[in-house]
Curated annotation (Swiss-Prot):
It comes from Escherichia coli (strain K12). It is found in: Cytoplasm. It is an enzyme of class 3 (hydrolase). This is Toxic protein SymE. Induction: Repressed by LexA, induced by DNA damage. During the SOS response (at protein level when expressed as a fusion protein). The mRNA stability and translation is controlled by the small regulatory RNA symR, which probably blocks ribosome binding. Expression of the proteinaceous toxin (putative endonuclease) is controlled by antisense sRNA SymR. Its main location: cytoplasm. GO terms for molecular function: DNA binding; identical protein binding; RNA binding; RNA endonuclease activity.
Length: 113
């Protein structure tokens, strides 16, 4: 008689067989010696459905016999003010002081000279 702990429980696979894809490692030619290097090409509408739209950053983890691709979430957009601040940081010290003086005038803390 079997023990109650040895009975296999049915489970649902994380990835359904309908979502499996089969590809073959091909090659790409490398200039200048035109040596062949292994290459894998993935394309299809299923990529976007899986969260890999055009322009998506992808994290690639490589292990022996296994490659895991993970779509990275899009970076939060910076506000216009933060973008402007980054531009001001690249200016010379003299121009940065002019920007500070301008902000002071706009904020009403300084009088126009």
């Amino acid at each position: 008689m079997t023990d109650t702990h040895s009975i296999a429980q049915p489970f649902e696979a994380e990835v359904s067989p309908a979502n499996n894809r089969h590809v073959t490692v091909g090659y790409a030619s490398r200039y200048p010696d035109y040596s062949r290097i292994p290459a894998i090409t993935l394309k299809g509408q299923w990529l976007e459905a899986a969260g890999f739209a055009t322009g998506t950053a992808v994290d690639v983890k490589v292990m022996e016999g296994c490659i895991v691709l993970t779509a990275q979430p899009p970076a939060a957009e910076e506000s216009e003010l933060m973008q402007s601040l980054r531009q001001v940081c690249k200016l010379s010290a003299r121009k940065q002081k002019q920007v500070q003086a301008f902000i002071g005038v706009i904020a009403g803390k300084q009088k126009v000279a």
